[in-house]
A protein has these predicted regions:
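Glycine-rich phosphate-binding "P-loop"
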Residues: 19-29, 75-92, 221-222
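Beta-hairpin (beta-strand-turn-beta-strand) motif
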Residues: 56, 78-80, 113-116, 138
Length: 246
């Protein structure tokens, strides 16, 4: 078995091939409640792995994340209302949204937009805010053999990711093998959402059915899915990565 290490997104160097032997755990916070985020942090703490968190809002848990030298913070701006805009809404501009998040996470070097919204103009603006790594490109592991990061024209680095829990749900990939996925060649960036980890989401329908209780810790926990779901897959993955770091 090839020895594998977990690393953060900002540790990727396109000029060096070390990223091929690493696994990158990333998390889209998506306005999750603190008890949901804390659950993901607790699971990660069992194995002392590296991770990158794409932040949507301020929370006291940022202090805990910053205190761990193996964690880093990126930003997760939501530009959807700029695209699907309602004329009656008072909508913030792209720069206002970036200002807001960079005030919360001034050290952020990476970005993954909500819904992976991206454009050449957005890349120019990201660069203005000292963002060096764009993670807005997904190439699903089951549609290609090998992917790699690449340098963009503005000297930013594009970091495609090849596993996302919500895309797995959309494709209904219930029986996917985390050992096989984690052993594939090329860049291995995984994207999870704490809300799906907490719920152990097994389908989009299950997630949608529980939306109204996502802020109710007791009810949300009571509705955690018993059969194999996102939480189970995540635990399988981090156990695999941890075993390879020994």
């Amino acid at each position: 078995m090839i020895k594998t290490y977990s690393e953060t997104i900002s540790e990727i160097n396109v000029e060096k091939m070390g990223w091929e032997r690493s696994i990158y755990l990333t998390f889209d916070i998506d306005w999750a409640s603190d008890f949901v985020i804390a659950d993901t942090l607790e699971l990660l703490s069992r194995f002392n792995l590296s991770a990158t968190f794409f932040i949507t809002h301020d929370t006291p848990l940022l202090k805990e994340i910053r205190a761990n030298p193996r964690y880093e913070l990126g930003i997760h701006p939501n530009f959807n209302d700029l695209i699907f805009r309602d004329g009656n809404q008072d909508i913030k501009t792209v720069r206002e949204k970036m200002d807001e998040l960079k005030q919360i996470v001034p050290e952020a070097l990476s970005v993954r937009s909500h819904s992976t919204t991206n454009s050449s103009k957005l890349l120019e603006i990201f660069q203005e805010y000292d963002i060096q790594f764009d993670c807005n490109y997904i190439i699903p592991y089951h549609v290609t053999d090998k992917i790699a990061p690449w340098r963009l024209w503005n000297d930013m680095t594009r970091i495609p990711y090849y596993y996302s829990d919500d895309l797995s749900l959309a494709y209904n990939l219930v029986d996917e093998s985390m050992p096989q996925i984690s052993e594939r060649e090329g860049l291995k960036v995984f994207d999870f959402h704490p809300v799906h980890i907490y719920l152990n989401t097994d389908s989009i329908a299950t997630y949608e059915k529980t939306r109204d209780i996502h802020r109710n810790e007791k009810l949300f926990l009571q509705n955690r899915v018993a059969k194999r779901g996102t939480r189970d897959k995540f635990l399988e993955l981090i156990e695999i990565v941890a075993s390879r770091e020994l």
